Structure formats: structure tokens, C-alpha cells
Regions:
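A structural signal for short, well-ordered beta-strand segments and their strand-loop junctions
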Residues: 2-5
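Flexible, low-complexity linker and terminal segments
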Residues: 7-221
Length: 221
């Protein structure tokens, strides 16, 4: 049997001494280091031997958490985990709420970009759907009872894409179909075919994914 575990090095990571358990849970929930158990006694295929059920929302890219202040739901990505560790401070900038209007929500950005866009460096091409502006993407984060806004470096957005890809690979080995991945591929195919404009993709990326997921669920009923 193989078990994967994660723990912080508190001084190096910029984490309080009593937060090791919390950080391990956060990095798991953010898909930074997903939890899995590999037990070959269960069968002769990966689908039988690999267990990822310790992770939240196992058929989606990210899981949703509720803001204790506003009651609103948001997705917990690896960028949100990075906010909790001081070692990533150079990749995060605090924003005033009004300044976020000029930036791209991370949820929308992640629909626009794939791992192949990273490999072929399309994320550096202005005008391409996958272009990532440095500190031009933002997230909201609940801290000390209020909602904070953080701009992300280009490298941190790329980190989100890479961790999402790794999670999708792990899901597939465990025999889990990622519904968001299917929706994203369909949306980008429509963009490439001219059925969906770049303007709508940029403005409604995450909303389009949500609509596709709802439509797929309704079709099953």
C-alpha cells in the first residue's frame, strides 16, 4: 500500500507552528497535493487500486466553499492555498475592491487556458485567448472576517493550470470523469469553430461552464 502525505516546514513556508494540520488540509482541498491511497490488493487495474475519495468534489476541478461573512460560495483553488503561506508573497498583491474591475477573475481565466497553451507558450501572446497578463488576474479570499482581493502573478496562474492538469490525470487513473474538463473542452471547441465569441468567453467563462454542467445534469434526469 502507498500513502501520500504532506506537511509544512513552518519557518520556511511562513506558517504558524500550530497550523501544520490546517495547511495539510488546505493543500489537499486546493488540489495542490491531492490525497490518494494506492492499494494493489484491491485489483489489477488503476481504477480498482487507486482511491481519491478523501478529496472534496472528486468529479470537479475545484471544490466550492462558503464565505462566512457574505454567505457567497467560491471555488477554492491552489492560489487560495498560496495566500495562506508567506513563501508565495511575491506572487500575490493586495487589491482594493474597485481595482479588481480591471482584472480577470481567476475562474474565467482558467476556462480560457489549457496545459497545452502553457507548453506551446500561447499564454505569452497578447490577443490569444490564453494570454495571461502578469498580475492581471485576481481572486477573492476571506481573511480575518472580511473579503480581500489579491492579484496573481503569471507564474501563479500557470501553477493553477499545472495542478489542475495533475488532478485531472489522477482522477482519470482512478476512473473518475471530470465534468468540468468535458465542459471546458466543449466550450473551447465552440470558440475555435466560431460558434462562441471570444468576447463572451472572456466575460462569462465560468458561467458558461456552470451552464454546461447544469445542462448535462438535466439531460441525465
Amino acid at each position: 500500500m502507498f500513502l501520500q502525505a504532506f506537511t509544512t516546514c513552518q519557518p520556511e513556508h511562513g506558517v504558524a507552528d500550530d497550523m501544520a494540520l490546517h495547511q495539510a488540509q488546505r493543500v489537499r482541498d486546493s488540489r495542490g497535493v491531492p490525497e490518494f491511497v494506492f492499494n494493489p490488493r484491491l485489483g489489477e487495474t488503476y481504477q480498482e487500486a487507486l482511491d481519491v475519495k478523501g478529496n472534496p468534489s472528486i468529479d470537479l476541478d475545484w471544490y466550492e466553499t462558503k464565505n462566512k461573512v457574505t454567505g457567497e460560495t467560491s471555488r477554492y483553488t491552489v492560489a487560495h492555498w498560496c495566500v495562506t503561506e508567506a513563501r508565495f508573497r511575491n506572487h500575490l498583491k493586495k487589491l482594493k475592491p474597485e481595482a479588481s474591475a480591471k482584472l480577470i477573475p481567476l475562474d474565467n481565466m482558467l476556462v480560457r487556458i489549457t496545459q497545452q497553451d502553457i507548453v506551446y507558450r500561447r499564454y505569452l501572446t497578447p490577443g490569444h485567448r490564453a494570454f495571461i497578463p502578469d498580475f492581471g488576474v485576481y481572486i477573492t479570499y476571506e481573511e480575518n472576517g472580511k473579503t480581500d482581493y489579491r492579484a496573481l502573478s503569471r507564474q501563479l496562474v500557470m501553477f493553477c493550470v499545472e495542478r489542475r492538469k495533475a488532478w485531472r490525470m489522477l482522477q482519470s487513473k482512478a476512473g473518475i470523469v471530470n465534468r468540468e474538463y468535458i465542459a471546458q473542452k466543449a466550450i473551447l471547441a465552440d470558440v475555435d469553430a466560431g460558434k462562441l465569441s471570444l468576447e463572451e468567453l472572456f466575460a462569462r467563462g465560468h458561467e458558461l461552464v456552470t451552464e454546461r454542467l447544469a445542462g448535462a445534469m438535466a439531460a441525465k434526469v
